[in-house]
């Protein structure tokens, strides 16, 4: 059984027990979270929503929040003595899927 959910502007294919990582939602660790924007559910037969499946809910538990490793962005324009170096660290929330209903 799997479901396709929309969380933080992204779509994820999840099963019970999966761990997903997405943009920070500002939730407390060990708290419960419900994803009501379920795009599709497959439990033997595929049910696709228009745009969401009515009555379908995916429940999860927040594991932790944190920051990813730094990504270095470097741009250089040749022969112009022009270069730009920036770093970026994404804040994330990690959630374990507990139930698909």
From Swiss-Prot:
Signal peptide: none annotated. Transmembrane segments: none annotated. Keywords: Ribonucleoprotein, Ribosomal protein, RNA-binding, rRNA-binding. One of its GO terms (cellular component) is ribonucleoprotein complex. InterPro entries: bL21-like, bL21-like_sf, Ribosomal_bL21, Ribosomal_bL21_CS. This protein binds to 23S rRNA in the presence of protein L20. Part of the 50S ribosomal subunit. Contacts protein L20. Belongs to the bacterial ribosomal protein bL21 family. This is Large ribosomal subunit protein bL21. It comes from Sulfurovum sp. (strain NBC37-1).
């Amino acid at each position: 059984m799997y479901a396709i959910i929309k969380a933080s502007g992204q779509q994820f294919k999840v099963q019970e027990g999966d761990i997903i990582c997405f943009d920070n939602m500002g939730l407390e660790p060990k708290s419960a979270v419900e994803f009501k924007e379920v795009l599709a559910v497959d439990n033997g037969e595929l049910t696709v929503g228009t745009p969401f499946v009515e009555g379908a809910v995916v429940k999860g538990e927040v594991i932790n929040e944190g920051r990813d490793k730094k990504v270095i962005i470097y741009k250089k324009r040749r022969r112009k003595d022009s270069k730009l170096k920036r770093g970026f660290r994404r804040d994330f929330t990690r959630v374990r899927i507990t139930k698909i209903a």
